[in-house]
A protein has these predicted regions:
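Alpha-helical substrate-recognition element adjacent to the catalytic core
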Residues: 32-239
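Bacterial Sec-dependent N-terminal signal peptides
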Residues: 15-35
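Bacterial N-terminal signal peptides that target proteins for export
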Residues: 1-9
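Short, flexible segments with low predicted structural confidence
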Residues: 4-5, 127-128, 263-264
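C-terminal cap/substrate-recognition subdomain and adjoining C-terminal extension
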Residues: 32-40, 154-359
Length: 359
């Protein structure tokens, strides 16, 4: 009798939906289907999307010879221009340094000459079209290290988020902190649902990246970027190996650049921090080629690499001719090309429109 009551109770719970979230307790006709989440609603049908879905379906199928176990489903994503805007009018971290050095009343009078020169080069580039100096990625990195030196990590996070809350220059209906490519966020959702772990591997400052992607649920321990040396707030000049940090000390940014995370440095950081070769890689520039090639050299698993091209002059501040030339280059290198103009139904979402820059 007790067994009968237990079975009846289990049936009632099942029918009430407490033990399942997929169906109610009923028979389905042959033509009825269970609702499944639809991904990629912001995409048009295109080669790149077809290739991505075919790849994921293959490597997640236990019966496939290309099956990849979940712990090895590693995907790496560049940030600027790959899933975050970079044409408003330049990289977020370039805009931030320009503001910090030339407009922020709390710092502009303190900026060293070389930092001021770097910020002015950015302003001349975005406002007057003057070419940036050679090797400006390193010039900027060294200037940025100095410009934010002395800030605690909490102070820097708040500073980045305050600037990110400003309206994105060249657009209406969007702040810098909202400037994510909606179709690429759907890629994150799709990969997560299929057992992939994805990492941000950016040339931008690691802590800037962390502040920006927090809002879309990417944890800070899956963010790799440019690094500066940190010290404890009471450490002074003593080496970390000799100093014991106390319980109520903060971590402070210094002016010492450790690494600019571009090109082969991305590969080195992936190896050191992730410890596995990615099977999927997404980027948009030559700074991502080494990461892509590392992924495609994976001799254990089938792999794939994707490059976005900024070819949409109607919805973004793009250079279509330059983008198409890059697309040919990426195709020749064996990467799948994602056209923002042809493949995306929307870039930033409804209500966002491109307008002229204002300075």
């Amino acid at each position: 009798m007790k067994k009968t009551l237990l079975w009846m109770l289990a049936a009632i719970l099942t029918c009430s939906g407490l033990t399942t979230t997929l169906t109610s307790c009923k028979d389905y006709d042959d033509d009825e289907t269970i609702e499944v989440k639809e991904y990629f609603t912001s995409w048009n049908k295109c080669e790149a999307l077809t290739a991505l879905k075919e790849y994921v379906e293959d490597v997640t199928n236990p019966k496939s010879p290309n099956y990849i176990s979940p712990e090895d489903r590693i995907a790496t994503f560049d940030m600027d221009g790959t899933f975050v805007g970079e044409l408003y009018p330049s990289y977020f971290e370039y805009n931030l340094l320009e503001y910090r050095v030339l407009d922020d009343a709390t710092y502009r009078d303190k900026a060293p000459d070389d930092v001021r020169e770097a910020a002015q080069a950015i302003r001349d580039f975005v406002r007057n079209g003057k070419a940036l100096p050679d090797h400006f990625d390193m010039i900027h990195a060294q200037a940025a290290a100095k410009a934010y030196a002395g800030m605690t990590l909490a102070q820097f996070d708040a500073y980045v988020k305050a600037y990110a809350a400003r309206p994105a220059n060249g657009f209406t209906g969007m702040t810098y902190g909202q400037s994510f490519y909606k179709p690429m966020l759907e890629v994150f959702d799709y990969l997560k649902a299929n057992g992939f772990t994805y990492y941000v591997v950016s040339g931008s400052d690691r802590f800037i990246c962390r502040s920006l992607v927090e809002s879309i649920g990417i944890p800070s321990n899956r963010v790799i970027g440019m690094d500066v040396k940190l010290v404890s707030s009471k450490q002074g000049e003593e080496a970390g190996v000799n100093y014991t940090m106390g319980q109520k000390e903060d971590l402070i940014r210094t002016d010492e650049l450790i690494i600019k995370n571009l090109k082969t440095n991305k590969v080195l950081q992936i190896s050191q921090e992730i410890g596995k070769v990615p099977v999927l890689s997404f980027g948009n520039s030559s700074g991502d080629q080494a990461m892509h090639n590392y992924c495609l050299s994976n001799d254990k698993y089938r792999s794939a690499a994707f490059m976005l091209i900024a070819d949409d002059e109607a919805r973004d501040h793009a250079n279509r001719e330059k983008a198409l030339n890059l697309g040919q280059k990426w195709n020749a290198a064996g990467y799948h090309v994602i056209s923002m103009r042809d493949d995306f139904k929307t870039i930033y979402g409804l209500g966002v429109q491109k307008v002229e820059f204002t300075f």
